[in-house]
Amino acid sequence: MSEDLSPTSSRVDLSNPHGFTKEGVDLSKLSPQELKLYKMYGKLPSKKDLLRHKMQDRQYFDSGDYALKKAGVIKSDDVIVNNSSNNLPVTNPSGLRESIIRRRMSSSSGGDSISRQGSISSGPPPRSPNK
């Protein structure tokens, strides 16, 4: 076993006629990537989902959730909820923009000085031509 164990070498031990190792791994069914990993490390990586396993042990999403829970503001049921429906926006931003544009267009047409007088959102007052 003093051979070069580089990831580019693809020589398989042909002394084992059945293709099984002493751990019971069938080398003939391994992908080239798995074969390289097995030759380099002597074992195959775990097949379980690591991220899901980590999320089961996690109690809080971040320090803010921990602080709110400790203060009693939220219940433990509300801390981590994997609900995809919460990611949806409450309003349609493009519809909101359209309504604002329509409102501005309707208020700017005809009687502009009367309807916009005293309005907070009308912007700065018009300048006199002398200044």
UniProtKB/Swiss-Prot annotation:
Keyword Zinc-finger attributed: no
Regions of compositional bias (Polar residues) in chain numbering: 1-13
Miscellaneous comment as given in the Swiss-Prot or TrEMBL entry: Present with 1400 molecules/cell in log phase SD medium.
Biological processes annotated in GO: cellular response to heat; negative regulation of nuclear-transcribed mRNA catabolic process, deadenylation-dependent decay; positive regulation of G1 to G0 transition; positive regulation of mitotic cell cycle phase transition
Regions of compositional bias (Low complexity) in chain numbering: 106-122
Organism: Saccharomyces cerevisiae (strain ATCC 204508 / S288c)
Gene this protein is translated from: IGO2
Function: Required for TORC1 to properly control gene expression and chronological life span. Plays an essential role in initiation of the G0 program by preventing the degradation of specific nutrient-regulated mRNAs via the 5'-3' mRNA decay pathway.
Description of post-translational modifications: Phosphorylated by RIM15.
InterPro entries referenced in this protein's UniProt entry, alphabetically: Endosulphine
Record-level Gene Ontology MF annotations: protein phosphatase inhibitor activity; protein-containing complex binding
Name recorded for this polypeptide: mRNA stability protein IGO2
